[in-house]
């Protein structure tokens, strides 16, 4: 089955003023679409890989399940497709975001001491990622939460890679320049701080519930 660009769960301007509509439009219809196109082109060369879903393709990165001819293409573009599909869902209109509560808040407090401390560590990971990449809040196999950053389009599902800590993602932030440069230019920390205003904590809670059941959210 061919991979497809998912529709956004909101309008391009819904995240204003924190993430601008022009950036969202270009990010979704150009950057994400390119990852989908490149991934499908790679899968066309190896039809047997089409039986793998997007999550399983990402989990296969760094293993011998992927032919060498397309391993890097799938790592970059399969990662890009998963990461962005996940990213769109963990954002929402600023009026709909109220902060974490319930089980996910308790898990954050158990792992980091407080929500504010978690945010501080997450901000540091996002701001400190040299070049392009992502910051992640993930559930580890022991049930604890951790914060990591990955380069380029790598993600916590790619556990076979030597520099990936692994886990099930709950929250992710794109810190590639194309995610923020039109509005924030080189002010990445300002973008990161603004982004918390559009985090969809209800979706994060759903992701946590899925992770507790061993399911990878997408």
Swiss-Prot record:
Its cofactor is Mn(2+). It catalyses: 2 superoxide + 2 H(+) = H2O2 + O2. Transmembrane segments: none annotated. Binds 1 Mn(2+) ion per subunit. Its main location: mitochondrion. Coiled coil: none annotated. Mn(2+) binds at residues 27, 84, 174, 178. InterPro entries: Mn/Fe_SOD, Mn/Fe_SOD_BS, Mn/Fe_SOD_C, Mn/Fe_SOD_N, Mn/Fe_SOD_N_sf, SOD_C_sf. Gene3D superfamilies: Fe,Mn superoxide dismutase (SOD) domain, Iron/manganese superoxide dismutase, C-terminal domain. One of its GO terms (molecular function) is superoxide dismutase activity. The keyword Metal-binding applies. Keywords: Manganese, Metal-binding, Mitochondrion, Oxidoreductase, Transit peptide. Its EC number is 1.15.1.1. Pfam families: Sod_Fe_C (PF02777), Sod_Fe_N (PF00081). The keyword Oxidoreductase applies. One of its GO terms (cellular component) is mitochondrial matrix. Belongs to the iron/manganese superoxide dismutase family. Destroys superoxide anion radicals which are normally produced within the cells and which are toxic to biological systems. Homotetramer. This is Superoxide dismutase [Mn], mitochondrial. It comes from Chlamydomonas reinhardtii.
């Amino acid at each position: 089955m061919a991979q497809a660009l998912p529709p956004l769960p909101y309008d391009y301007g819904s995240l204003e003023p924190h993430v601008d509509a022009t950036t969202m439009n270009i990010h979704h219809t150009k950057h994400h679409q390119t990852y989908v196109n490149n991934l499908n082109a790679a899968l066309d060369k190896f039809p047997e890989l089409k039986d793998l879903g997007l999550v399983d393709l990402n989990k296969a990165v760094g293993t011998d399940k992927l032919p060498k001819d397309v391993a890097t293409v799938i790592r970059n573009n399969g990662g890009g497709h998963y990461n962005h599909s996940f990213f769109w869902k963990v954002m929402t209109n600023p009026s709909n975001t109220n902060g974490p509560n319930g089980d996910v808040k308790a898990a954050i407090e158990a792992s980091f001491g407080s929500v504010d401390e978690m945010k501080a560590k997450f901000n540091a990971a996002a701001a400190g990622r040299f070049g392009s990449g992502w910051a992640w809040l993930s559930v580890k196999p022991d049930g604890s939460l951790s914060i990591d950053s990955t380069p380029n389009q790598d993600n916590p599902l790619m556990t076979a890679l030597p520099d990936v800590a692994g886990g099930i993602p709950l929250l992710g932030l794109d810190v590639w320049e194309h995610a923020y440069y039109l509005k924030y230019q080189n002010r990445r920390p300002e973008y990161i701080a603004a982004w918390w205003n559009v985090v969809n904590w209800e979706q994060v809670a759903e992701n946590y519930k899925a992770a507790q059941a061993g399911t990878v959210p997408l």
